[in-house]
Amino acid sequence: MSDYIIRGMAADGQVRFFAGTTKEIVETARSIHNTSPVATAALGRLLTAGALMGATCKNDSDLLTLQIQCSGPIGGLTVTADAHCNVKGYVNNPEVILHANDKGKLDVAKALDMGVLSVIKDIGLKEPYIGQTQLVSGEIAEDLTYYFATSEQIPTSVALGVLMEKNNTVKQAGGFIIQLMPFASEELISDLEKRLGEFTSITALLDQGMEPLDIVKQIFEGYNVEVTDTIPTKWHCNCSKERFSQAVISLGKKEIANLLADNKPIEVNCQFCNSSYTCLLYTSPSPRDRTRSR
C-alpha cells in the first residue's frame, strides 16, 4: 500500500492523533540523495515528521519547513511539507558514516549532536511564524516533542522511525503524533504517560504487519478511537523550468547584466530532488549595435 496518514480523535475527543507509514517517501529520498544508512534514518524521521505535521495544517495553502542546524557530521537537514502531506527534503552531508550506538542502532543523535530545531509555518500572514528550540537529544522525535511543549504549549508525544534492510534500502518507516486537548482528564494523562512510556518501536510494529490504525488502537486500548481522515502522503518536489526562469528574472537588471557579460549558461541544481536546470541568456542587438558590428 502507498504511504498514507490517518487523522482522528481518541478517548472521547480528549486526544487527537496523526499516524502514518512513510516507507516509499523515505526510500525515494534515499535513492535521490544516495544517503548513507544513518543519513537515511535522520532524513527519514524528519520527512515523516513533516508529513504528519502537514496533516495539522488548517488551510490548503499552508506550508511548513522543518530545519535542523547542528554541529554533528551530518551538517543539518531541511524538510518542507504542505497541507496535503506532500513532502521533500535534503541532508547537508548525505555520505556521513558512523558506528552503531551502544544499542546497536543507527546513531542519529551522534550524527546531529548539538543544534537548533526550527519550525517555520507560512499560513498566509505577512511574516511566517518561526519557532525555535534547542535539540534535546538529537533523536528528532524527542526534539519535536520538546518543541511542541515549549514553543506551542501542546503536550505531545512524537514517535518516528526508519528501519533499514541489509542492502541499505528502506524496509519500514513511519510515525505518530499524539496531542492532549486542553480538557483532557488527569486520569487519562497519567494512563497515557504510562502507555507511551512502555511503547518501544513503531517500525518494529509496522514490520510485524500492523497498520497505523492498529498501532493507534493498541496505544488506546480500552478507549474509543475515531479516524476522521485518511490522507495520501508522498514525496513531491515542485521545482520546474518555469520556476527557475522566474527566479532568474527576479535577480534584477544589474545581476542579469553581469550574467550576460559572462556569456555562460546558468546552471542550477535543486537541493531537494537533484534536478538540474540550465538557462542561456542572450540579447538581440539594437540597430546601433548591428551597425557597429559591421
Feature names for model-found ranges:
Residues 250-260:
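A conserved acidic, glycine/proline-rich C-terminal tail/linker
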Residues 230-235, 264-266:
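Short metal-coordination and nucleic-acid-contact micro-motifs, chiefly zinc-binding Cys/His arrays
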Residues 238-240, 274:
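Cys/His-coordinated zinc-binding microdomains
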Residues 243, 277:
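Cys/His-rich microdomains that often coordinate metals
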Residues 282-291:
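Conserved small/polar residues in nucleotide/adenosyl-binding loops
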Residues 270:
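Short cysteine-rich clusters marking metal-coordination/redox-active sites
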Residues 1-229:
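Interaction interfaces in information-processing and related assembly proteins
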Residues 247-248, 280-281:
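Short Cys/His-rich "knuckle" micro-motifs
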